[in-house]
């Protein structure tokens, strides 16, 4: 069994991660650290887990008793923890924050997008789990980058559910504001652009195009629906072949002929991609569950790879489409 610890257990991604690990046949939750909830039952915070666990949050850090440490912390907190604590060499780390997503000589975290870096993930010790928008957008265009086809600007519009804003309420996540409403935020400047550009440059060394990304707040709870378009003169049959070839040996990303609906992926670790060609424009629709494929499901996928398991173990999940 893989003995797991979680630091930062009160948020939405932590709740989903706890649920996945409790039901994973090869994982055992050893502790869940939460400074704000120490001593409280997990079910006091994550009510959907009633009957699933008797665990309580702790302020202790028994790092010597685990094989894998997950960080579900606010951005910046993982880095602070690593600077002030010594994690045993034998303990692997998966960080769900953005602290180590940009690779560099100052750390050894591998960017944990399996559809891009599966081989490197299998041989890594520290994994930086990708962002939710970054995951959805990258999966839509990675095959183009591999075939050196990103030679003009990408135009992306992506709408996300309210859980993407985290568990702490704010003026823009309050129900009375978010319900029956829609708005954009951080146009052209979203923080996930850096990791997207890093990945595309990794596959296509000549890549220097701009990503014109408009993030949108949706009036639903979970999921990301992204539409991307780019200039492309190649016919749709060849484009589809390129995508199917790229994702042929990946377990969670699928190309669909039918125009898909977001509910087909909500509550799963899947990404659905639909391709359309209109004149010289290629339209790419990609969609994921922001808390699963965009966060905790992808973290468990990375755990499976780190420990030599079949990558779908613990991730056969039913969509909430009906």
Swiss-Prot record:
Disulfide bonds: none
Record's keyword annotation contains Oxidoreductase: yes
Catalytic center residues: 132
Broad class of enzyme this protein falls into: oxidoreductase
Pfam families listed in its UniProt record: Semialdhyde_dh, Semialdhyde_dhC_1
CDD domains reported for this sequence: AGPR_1_C, AGPR_1_N
EC number: 1.2.1.38
GO terms under biological process: L-arginine biosynthetic process
Catalytic activity field: N-acetyl-L-glutamate 5-semialdehyde + phosphate + NADP(+) = N-acetyl-L-glutamyl 5-phosphate + NADPH + H(+)
Annotated localization: Cytoplasm
Pathway: Amino-acid biosynthesis; L-arginine biosynthesis; N(2)-acetyl-L-ornithine from L-glutamate: step 3/4
Keywords attached to this entry: Amino-acid biosynthesis, Arginine biosynthesis, Cytoplasm, NADP, Oxidoreductase
Any one annotated GO CC term: cytoplasm
MF term (GO), any: NAD binding
Keyword Oxidoreductase: yes
HAMAP family assigned to the protein according to its UniProt record, in alphabetical order: ArgC_type1
Function: Catalyzes the NADPH-dependent reduction of N-acetyl-5-glutamyl phosphate to yield N-acetyl-L-glutamate 5-semialdehyde.
Similarity remark: Belongs to the NAGSA dehydrogenase family. Type 1 subfamily.
Record protein name field: N-acetyl-gamma-glutamyl-phosphate reductase
Originating organism: Parabacteroides distasonis (strain ATCC 8503 / DSM 20701 / CIP 104284 / JCM 5825 / NCTC 11152)
């Amino acid at each position: 069994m893989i003995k797991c610890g979680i630091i930062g257990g009160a948020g939405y991604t932590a709740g989903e991660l706890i649920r996945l690990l409790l039901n994973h046949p090869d994982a055992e939750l050893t502790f869940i650290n939460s400074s704000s909830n120490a001593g409280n039952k997990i079910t006091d915070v994550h009510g959907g887990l009633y009957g699933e666990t008797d665990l309580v949050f702790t302020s202790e850090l028994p790092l010597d008793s685990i094989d894998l440490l997950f960080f579900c912390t606010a951005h910046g907190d993982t880095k602070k923890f690593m600077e002030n604590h010594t994690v045993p060499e034998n303990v692997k780390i998966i960080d769900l924050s953005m602290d180590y997503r940009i690779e560099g000589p100052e750390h050894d975290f591998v960017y944990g997008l399996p559809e891009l870096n599966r081989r490197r993930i299998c041989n890594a010790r520290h994994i930086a789990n990708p962002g939710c928008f970054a995951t959805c957008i990258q999966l839509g265009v990675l095959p183009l980058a591999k075939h050196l086809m990103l030679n003009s600007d990408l135009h992306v519009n992506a709408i996300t559910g309210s859980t993407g804003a985290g568990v702490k309420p704010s003026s823009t996540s309050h129900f009375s504001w978010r319900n029956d409403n829609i708005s954009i935020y951080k146009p052209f400047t979203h923080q996930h652009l850096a990791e997207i550009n890093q990945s595309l440059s990794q596959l296509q060394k000549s890549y220097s195009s701009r990503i014109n990304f408009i993030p949108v707040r949706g009036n639903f709870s979970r999921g990301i629906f992204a539409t991307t378009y780019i200039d492309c003169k190649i016919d749709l049959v060849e484009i589809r072949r390129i995508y199917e070839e790229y994702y042929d040996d990946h377990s969670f990303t699928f190309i669909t002929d039918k125009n898909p609906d977001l509910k087909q992926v909500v509550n799963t670790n899947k990404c659905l991609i639909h391709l359309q060609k209109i004149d010289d424009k290629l339209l790419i629709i990609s969609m994921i569950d922001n808390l699963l494929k965009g966060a905790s499901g992808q973290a468990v996928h990375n755990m499976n790879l780190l420990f030599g398991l079949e990558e779908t173990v613990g991730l056969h999940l039913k969509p909430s489409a009906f």
